[in-house]
Amino acid sequence: MGNFVCIEISGDQMLDRIIRCLCGKGYIRNLEKNLRALQREMEDLRATQHEVQNKVAREESRHQQRLEAVQVWLDRVNSIDIECKDLLSVSPVELQKLCLCGLCSKYVCSSYKYGKRVFLLLEEVTKLKSEGNFDEVSQPPPRSEVEERPTQPTIGQEEMLKKAWNRLMEDGVGIMGLHGMGGVGKTTLFKKIHNKFAETGGTFDIVIWIVVSQGAKLSKLQEDIAEKLHLCDDLWKNKNESDKATDIHRVLKGKRFVLMLDDIWEKVDLEAIGIPYPSEVNKCKVAFTTRDQKVCGQMGDHKPMQVKCLEPEDAWELFKNKVGDNTLRSDPVIVGLAREVAQKCRGLPLALSCIGETMASKTMVQEWEHAIDVLTRSAAEFSDMQNKILPILKYSYDSLEDEHIKSCFLYCALFPEDDKIDTKTLINKWICEGFIGEDQVIKRARNKGYEMLGTLIRANLLTNDRGFVKWHVVMHDVVREMALWIASDFGKQKENYVVRARVGLHEIPKVKDWGAVRRMSLMMNEIEEITCESKCSELTTLFLQSNQLKNLSGEFIRYMQKLVVLDLSHNPDFNELPEQISGLVSLQYLDLSWTRIEQLPVGLKELKKLIFLNLCFTERLCSISGISRLLSLRWLSLRESNVHGDASVLKELQQLENLQDLRITESAELISLDQRLAKLISVLRIEGFLQKPFDLSFLASMENLYGLLVENSYFSEINIKCRESETESSYLHINPKIPCFTNLTGLIIMKCHSMKDLTWILFAPNLVNLDIRDSREVGEIINKEKAINLTSIITPFQKLERLFLYGLPKLESIYWSPLPFPLLSNIVVKYCPKLRKLPLNATSVPLVEEFEIRMDPPEQENELEWEDEDTKNRFLPSIKPLVRRLKIHYSGMGFLNVKNQNPRFFFYCFIYLLVVHLDCIIDLHSDTSGMCCVVHLDYVFHFPFVFPKTFCILFRLHFYTIKSLCV
């Protein structure tokens, strides 16, 4: 039989429990009423929750931080809401259990428990609703904890730090890039910016510092950022990149953050990482450093800031700090030597620091002299150069994607230290060396060359001076040493590149193995003769320009069958090529400009591959007989030579079927007789034309013309006629949508004394440089009456970068009203006493900080009339001195060594202007040695337009001029 359990309960207890169940809190009796109340109160609570959430969102958009009590309340509401939905979802079933008009239940215990839950939840909802009336829902965020990054004291970066910080803090700037060459101090400056966030307090919620470096992967960047955000646990690491990006975005989207990316080499995809894009709404910031300016544009910063090398005095201060006072004071001679060593670093902080630390303990004068010798002769051999400096710079070289671009970069090391390299000449040589490809069209190849040049500039491997971008580039001396180090196979094959440019050589250097030499540069020395025999069977490039060469031995070039580029220019006493020139069967580039060559050798016709031949300024060359045999010739310059466009020249040139670019002087006959050749002319000088009126219509057919000089021509009016629908019309009525001179970028008008205006230049819409000088009747540049029908269609000077006005005594107006000058960087006005107003208003020039006005005499500045006060305030600071003081040392060899008192001054001139301006001499005396005379003169700050030639080191002057100076 089964077991029985007996529980004894008194009747009074049972009755008491039943009464409490039915009558106490009324969990069963009031269930239906409580459910209705709960539903109503919950709706009110949700409305209150929505209001609080809206308040919080508004405050957080202002970068306020929600109160912790508010967040707790919102969390409780969310929890209660879920519980309420659960209870209400089963309410129909629970109500069916009631009986006796809701006073009792068929399932008393079950209904009692449910009713109790409803009652308690109703109390909680009512309480939460009353607590939701917050006076404040947010507070200012606490000061962000930015851990300062260790950094050494800096010298010379204070101004750059201020500019970079101010720009980053601008409301409209969300992304800012700093670019500059390796070792220039970008990371140091970046650390200073980072540490300023620690000083300024809680403007931002979080500042994230990430070192990217070359080859960094997306996953690595996400992991580094996640660590800063405390996301990087084991679970997070196992997520894919997309989910990681979602997590990063979720954390950062509610924060005002700063992301600092140091040393990026390519575009960083912020979206793929999960970084909310900075905007004026979220006020977040992304800053980065890079060596490549191209990356700045890819990242969205189209006005990046360049970190440049230190100015000389700042560089000296940094170097002194590294060397130490004890060493500098150990011998009075050492200070001067130390300055020389510091100058070798050219303001590069990396080199200044490393070399300064190396020299810190060296107290013997001989040690410093040895350092100067090594840094001058072969800096790569200097202690620590190959370990601490060159490898860091080499990263920029390694990042170049194209092997041809790398070759172009190494090629620039053939030029002297701190040399201003002419870009046109450089690119022409690149074309012949095969760096630019196989394109047979010179214009396309040249454009490709400029693209490659731009790549090197953006990579900060080359630099350019503001205002001279199109003409010259510079390779930093330490970067040049890196290039030579690479070219010599990191010092293992030093005779690959024999570069002894501008080092004072009087004869060619001794080479152990001529057969190993690939490229040789002996330019800018004092070599007079090369008579030795050399078996340079592998030589492809030979630079001998700017020497005092008189004789080039045929034996020296006999074995140079692979020679591609030969530059003999600027040897004023060189008058004859050896017949062995015919053996240079691979030669593609030959430059004989500025020599005294009298005739072309018979053997020249054997140079079947010759593409470029430069014979400009060969004043003794009377004939180009035989040049027609150079069937591959594509580029020929006869400018300022003694060869003119007569019938014999025309016959020779007509047979050059591949010729694409011709530069010649006084060739009206050539232009009229052969339209094909006329179309090839790119630079033209016209002198002594006496037509009245002067008809420029024949120039309209010269599709390739970009440089024009009109000199000593007497005419009062210029006519331009174009054919349109078989009808000739004057230049005032031709279709301005089809300008006559679409390619003309440089124009010089000189000594045209009957010319009154230059209104015709309206039909040269791409004019970049305009130079008008010594024309006494010019009263206005654009005549309003002549141009009135055109100015509604044509806006003049939209491509103009430089305007030079000199010796125009009647000039009163450039243009009658203010004009926009989107590209103008320089206006030079000298001896134009009646010019009182420039065509400028406050909005004419977009970048006034890069704009200069130079006037002489200086008092004319005070007589200028301005459009309004805003215009005056904007441009008055742009007015700079015009006259520069030069010191010239004459060595008696037909050259003048020019030393500018301002080392940053970049001096240009035309050879035929030198004598004109020597009336500016203010002092003349012999130097202390008695070996040369010293000339002080004031020279106009001048820009090269159509016929630019750099005379940074040497000026060639006629001997009779020098003799007259020495009297």
Swiss-Prot record:
Region (Disordered): 132-153
PANTHER family per record: NB-ARC DOMAIN-CONTAINING PROTEIN (PTHR33463:SF220), NB-ARC DOMAIN-CONTAINING PROTEIN-RELATED (PTHR33463)
Organism: Arabidopsis thaliana
GO aspect biological process, one term: defense response
Keywords: ATP-binding, Coiled coil, Leucine-rich repeat, Nucleotide-binding, Plant defense, Repeat
LRR repeat placement: 516-537, 538-559, 562-585, 586-608, 609-631
Record protein name field: Probable disease resistance protein At1g61190
InterPro entries assigned to the protein according to its UniProt record, in alphabetical order: Apaf_helical, LRR_dom_sf, LRR_R13L4/SHOC2-like, NB-ARC, P-loop_NTPase, Plant_NBS-LRR, WH-like_DNA-bd_sf
Residues where ATP binds: 180-187
Domain NB-ARC residue range list: 138-441
Coiled coil stretches, renumbered: 20-68
Family: Belongs to the disease resistance NB-LRR family.
Protein purpose: Probable disease resistance protein.
